[in-house]
A protein has these predicted regions:
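Conserved adenine-nucleotide phosphate-binding loops and their immediately adjacent elements
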Residues: 3, 7-51, 62
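Winged-helix-like regulatory helical subdomains adjacent to P-loop NTPase cores
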Residues: 36, 43, 65, 78, ...
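Post-nucleotide-binding-loop coupling segment downstream of the phosphate-binding loop, primarily
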Residues: 38, 44, 48-52, 58-130
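A conserved switch/coupling segment of P-loop NTPase cores
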Residues: 51-54, 74-86, 118-196, 204
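Short beta-strand segments
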Residues: 62-63, 90-93, 136-139, 162-164, ...
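A short helix-loop-helix "switch/interaction" segment in the helical subdomain of ASCE P-loop NTPases
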Residues: 204-219
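Loop-to-helix "switch" segment enriched in basic
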Residues: 219-249
Length: 249
């Protein structure tokens, strides 16, 4: 059996879910999401996304790499599944251009060319249906000039969420993702450091978090793990950061 047929049988013909999937679950958004107890400082943004979902519309979730855009989308998709919200979901990982991305993701495509399969995907998103249709497009990294297929998104009748480092997409409302509050950043580091910090070490961490380069969730996760497994103690960790990260900052 072909993978597309298997996924179709599991997710569209079974009664185990209140969502129907127009695409394979081969997108980053379907990787296991961070548990709520380890998801720090994004409660308001996640609530905003839930409101956007119910309000419908087209949204560009914009921010620098590693700031947490994809994880926010994972949390939203996970919430949709857990709450058994009835809808049709298309989740697409952006690769090369939108046509190629659709061609690799959508189920039940019969066209021989990428162009034909792309327009089949557009048709599936445009179909009238009693359930809400939602497209999640993750890590779109081109402008409309670089990828003209993107211009077709604004005319679709479905709800769309696009994560990107780009700050503008025609027809979309931009929702900027910035660094979490300092208290949340501290928790991200400590959650990955896996050692209890002394008051002095907490003060040191607080000083580091004043610098913009360390106000980055993915960076803090990596530093926390590095501090645990490689540096061994806080003195060495702080020394390495100061000596080796100044050029990056």
């Amino acid at each position: 059996l072909k993978p597309k047929h298997i996924w179709n049988c599991i997710y569209q013909n079974s009664g185990e879910t209140r969502q129907s999937f127009l695409t394979l679950r081969n997108c980053e958004l379907f990787r296991k999401s961070v548990k709520a107890s380890h998801f720090f400082g994004r409660e308001e943004e996640l609530y905003d996304l839930k409101e956007m979902f119910f309000n419908s519309g087209k949204y560009l979730i914009s921010g620098i790499g590693g700031i947490g855009k994809t994880e926010l989308m994972r949390q939203l998709v996970s919430w949709i599944e857990q709450e058994e919200v009835k809808c049709r979901i298309a989740a697409v990982q952006y690769e090369e251009n939108l046509a190629v991305s659709f061609s690799r993701s959508f189920l039940n495509l019969t066209g021989e060319s990428v162009e034909e399969r792309f327009h089949e995907g557009i048709y599936h998103l445009s179909e009238e249906h009693q359930e809400k249709t939602v497209l999640f497009l993750d890590n779109m990294n081109h402008t409309e000039e670089e990828d003209p297929y993107l211009s077709e998104l604004k005319d679709l009748p479905c709800t769309i969420f696009v994560t990107s480092r780009q700050k503008h997409l025609d027809g979309f409302t931009t929702f900027g993702i910035k660094a979490p509050q300092k208290s949340a950043l501290s928790l991200i580091f400590r959650d990955n450091y896996n050692k209890i910090l002394s008051r002095e070490e907490k003060d040191r961490l607080s000083r580091l978090l004043e610098k913009e380069i360390f106000q980055h969730p993915l960076t803090l996760k990596l530093l926390g793990k590095a501090g645990t497994y490689y540096f061994g103690n806080w003195d060495y960790l702080e020394e390495e950061l100061q000596n080796n990260w100044n050029d990056v900052a």
